[in-house]
C-alpha cells in the first residue's frame, strides 16, 4: 500500500493489474536514477574545478607576506608583530592546511617589539630570516637577522646573528630584503636619511653585503618620496598620523624576462591609507647597482587600488615561481576597506596572482583582483595531503 499524507493512493494489487501504472513507475525510476547519475557527475566536475582553483585572500589576515620556493616546497611568513612564524606547503594557495611553526620569540628587550616584515631566505645552504624590531619605541627600529644551519628550516633552531648596522648613526631601518646579482649579495631596505624631527621620510637604500649579516659598503639611496602618489598620509575620512610620514618602503628585487633589467618594486604612501601602492625602479643588469644614477623610477604607480572592486592598498610584493617553473606569481598584501588605523594589521591580508610579461619582456602585474575570484592554481601544484 502506498500512501501520501495518510491517504491511500494505490496498492500493490492495483499495480499488478494496471500495466499503465507499472510502465509509469519504471519510467519514473529510470528518470530518478538518471538525475542522480547526472548530479553525481556534475558534483564531481565541481569538486575537480575547486581542486584546480583558489580564491584570495590566502589568510583572513597577515600583513607583509613573503615566500620562497625551495626544493619542491614553499616557505611562507608574514608579520605577526611579537614573534615569527614559518609555514611550509606544497600548495601556496591552501595555506590554512599548511604546516606552521613558531621559529622565533625574542628575549632581548632591545628587539622584542614591533617585529615587522620578516623575510625568509636560503643563502649558501643556510636559512636566514630578516626582520625589523625595536625596544618599544618605533623610532628605534633596526634590522636583524637570525640563522638556522639545518637543511630544513622547520627543524633545527634559528639563532640571532645580530643587528645589521646600516649606517654609523644607527638611523631607522626596516623592511630588509636580500638578493643575489652577478655573484654578489645585496641588501635593500627602507630607512631615514637622518633622525626624524617633526616629520618622517622613508627612503629606499641598497648596499653590497660581506656576508648575510654584515654590509660591505656604505648605504646608497636609490629612491625617496617625490611624486604626489608617494606622499599620501591622510585618509579620505581625515584620519591621519600624528605628523607627516612620506613613505618608500618594502623594496623587493625582481627582473625582466631576459634578466637584462634589474627591478626593485617598493611600496609608497601610508599603509593605513587606500593610497598605499607599488612603485618601480629599474637598472641595467650590467650597471653599477650602487650608483644612484643607474636607477630610473617609474613616474606612476605600477600596482594600485581598485575601489570599484573593493581592493585597497595593494603593495608589499614578493615573487615566487609555480612548482613546475613555467609561471611567476606575485604575493602581496591588500585590504577590502579603504582605511585602517596607523599600525593596524588586521585589515591587511595576503593575496596571490599570476603575472604576465609585456612586449618588452617586463613584468605585467595586471590589476589587483577582487577577493573570492576563482583563479587557476599555479602550474604543477601538488595539493596538501
Task: Report each predicted region and the residues it spans.
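Bacterial Sec-dependent N-terminal signal peptides
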Residues: 1-47
Amino acid at each position: 500500500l502506498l500512501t501520501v499524507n495518510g491517504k491511500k493512493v494505490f496498492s500493490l494489487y492495483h499495480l499488478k493489474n494496471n500495466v499503465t501504472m507499472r510502465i509509469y513507475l519504471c519510467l519514473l525510476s529510470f528518470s530518478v536514477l538518471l538525475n542522480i547519475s547526472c548530479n553525481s557527475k556534475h558534483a564531481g566536475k565541481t569538486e575537480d574545478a575547486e581542486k584546480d582553483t583558489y580564491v584570495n585572500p590566502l589568510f583572513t589576515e597577515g600583513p607583509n607576506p613573503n615566500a620562497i620556493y625551495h626544493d619542491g616546497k614553499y616557505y611562507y611568513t608574514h608579520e605577526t608583530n611579537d614573534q615569527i612564524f614559518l609555514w611550509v606547503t606544497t600548495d601556496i594557495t591552501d595555506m590554512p592546511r599548511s604546516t606552521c611553526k613558531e621559529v622565533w620569540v625574542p628575549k632581548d628587550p632591545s628587539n622584542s617589539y614591533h617585529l615587522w616584515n620578516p623575510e625568509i631566505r636560503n643563502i649558501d645552504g643556510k636559512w636566514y630570516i630578516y626582520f625589523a624590531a625595536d625596544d618599544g619605541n618605533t623610532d628605534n627600529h633596526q634590522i636583524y637577522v637570525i640563522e638556522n644551519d639545518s637543511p630544513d628550516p622547520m627543524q633545527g633552531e634559528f639563532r640571532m646573528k645580530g643587528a645589521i648596522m646600516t649606517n654609523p648613526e644607527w638611523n631607522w631601518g626596516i623592511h630588509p630584503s636580500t638578493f643575489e646579482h652577478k655573484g654578489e649579495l645585496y641588501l635593500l631596505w627602507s630607512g631615514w636619511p637622518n633622525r626624524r624631527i617633526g616629520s618622517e621620510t622613508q627612503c629606499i637604500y641598497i648596499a653590497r653585503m660581506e656576508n648575510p649579516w654584515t654590509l660591505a659598503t656604505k648605504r646608497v639611496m636609490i629612491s625617496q618620496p617625490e611624486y604626489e602618489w608617494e606622499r599620501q598620509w591622510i585618509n579620505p575620512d581625515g584620519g591621519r598620523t600624528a605628523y607627516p610620514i612620506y613613505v618608500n618602503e618594502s623594496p623587493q628585487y625582481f627582473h625582466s624576462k631576459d634578466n637584462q633589467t634589474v627591478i626593485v618594486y617598493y611600496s609608497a604612501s601610508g599603509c593605513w591609507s587606500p593610497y598605499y601602492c607599488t612603485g618601480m625602479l629599474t637598472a641595467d643588469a650590467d650597471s653599477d647597482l650602487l650608483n644612484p644614477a643607474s636607477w630610473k623610477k617609474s613616474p606612476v604607480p605600477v600596482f594600485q587600488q581598485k575601489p570599484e572592486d573593493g581592493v585597497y592598498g595593494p603593495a608589499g610584493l614578493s615573487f615566487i615561481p609555480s612548482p613546475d617553473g613555467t609561471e611567476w606569481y606575485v604575493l602581496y598584501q591588500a585590504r577590502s576597506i579603504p582605511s585602517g588605523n596607523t599600525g593596524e594589521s588586521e585589515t591587511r591580508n595576503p593575496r596571490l596572482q599570476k603575472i604576465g610579461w609585456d612586449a618588452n619582456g617586463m613584468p605585467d602585474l595586471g590589476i589587483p583582483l577582487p577577493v573570492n575570484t576563482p583563479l587557476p592554481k599555479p602550474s604543477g601544484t601538488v595539493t596538501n595531503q
